[in-house]
């Protein structure tokens, strides 16, 4: 899945020196706390991304709508990601796990035996977060935006557009998805019911 690829095909990044921090308003390398993880524990909508890697860009162009649920594990420093993709008017469900590096403010995933990383950029004021990856690579760098609401404000859209320009890409590279094309409502409902039943079974066995 394209979102899955974005989340896992990542590189460790240095701190970003903002030329206009008051305008870009992003912080890279901020430690991830329990409060941050509690805030992330929610339903999120993939809004869009600016990606120069041609393979990833092609995958994103196929997506009509994506939303996902994050469930952090504070003990193991991992998070479960349950994704719902609308592609070609069909819903595709996927589940994966990411590692959490609290001090570095990064998320990680093992791919082919190699641990790769992404910087988490929290935009708490806007109810959103960004993931930055491969910023050092002029041909593969990318930035994605995720929010708690699919219909983002003009202010958040502007923040993302400025951030994209700041890391060396053009606004024309941004691909936005259309939340109105969502076909995963029923699949999400079925998945939630299945999870409830799974939780019930152990309790019934102990009764």
UniProtKB/Swiss-Prot annotation:
Record-linked Pfam families: Lipocalin
Signal peptide: 1-18
Cysteine disulfide links: 91-184
Superkingdom per UniProt: Eukaryota
Residues modified as Pyrrolidone carboxylic acid: 19
Tissue: Expressed by the liver and secreted in plasma.
Locations listed in the record: Secreted
GO biological process: acute-phase response; regulation of immune system process
GO CC entries: extracellular space
Keywords: Acute phase, Disulfide bond, Glycoprotein, Pyrrolidone carboxylic acid, Secreted, Signal, Transport
Positions glycosylated per UniProt: 25, 34, 76, 94, 104
CDD domains: lipocalin_AGP-like (cd19451)
Any further remark recorded for this protein: Eight genes coding for different forms of alpha-1-AGP are present in mus carolis.
Primary role: Functions as a transport protein in the blood stream. Binds various ligands in the interior of its beta-barrel domain. Appears to function in modulating the activity of the immune system during the acute-phase reaction.
UniProt similarity note: Belongs to the calycin superfamily. Lipocalin family.
Domain text: Contains a beta-barrel that binds various ligands in its interior.
Entry protein name: Alpha-1-acid glycoprotein 1
Lineage of origin: Eukaryota, Metazoa, Chordata, Craniata, Vertebrata
Gene that this sequence comes from: Orm1
């Amino acid at each position: 899945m394209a979102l899955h690829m974005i989340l896992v095909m990542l590189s460790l990044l240095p701190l970003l020196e903002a030329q206009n921090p008051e305008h870009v308003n992003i912080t890279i390398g901020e430690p991830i706390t329990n409060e941050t993880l509690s805030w992330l524990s929610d339903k999120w909508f993939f809004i869009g991304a600016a990606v120069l890697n041609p393979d990833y860009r092609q995958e994103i162009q196929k997506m009509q709508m994506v939303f996902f649920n994050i469930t952090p594990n504070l003990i193991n420093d991992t998070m479960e990601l349950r994704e719902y993709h609308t592609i070609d008017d069909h819903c595709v469900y996927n589940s994966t796990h990411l590692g959490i590096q609290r001090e570095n403010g990064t998320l990680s995933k093992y791919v082919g035996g190699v641990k790769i990383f992404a910087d988490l950029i929290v935009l708490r004021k806007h109810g959103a977060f960004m993931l930055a990856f491969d910023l050092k690579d002029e041909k593969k760098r990318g930035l994605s935006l995720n929010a708690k609401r699919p219909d983002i404000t003009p202010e958040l859209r502007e923040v993302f557009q400025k951030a994209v320009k700041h890391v060396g890409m053009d606004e024309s590279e941004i691909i936005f998805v259309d939340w109105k094309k969502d076909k995963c409502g029923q699949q999400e409902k079925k998945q939630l019911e299945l999870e409830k039943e799974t939780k019930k079974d152990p309790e019934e066995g102990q009764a």
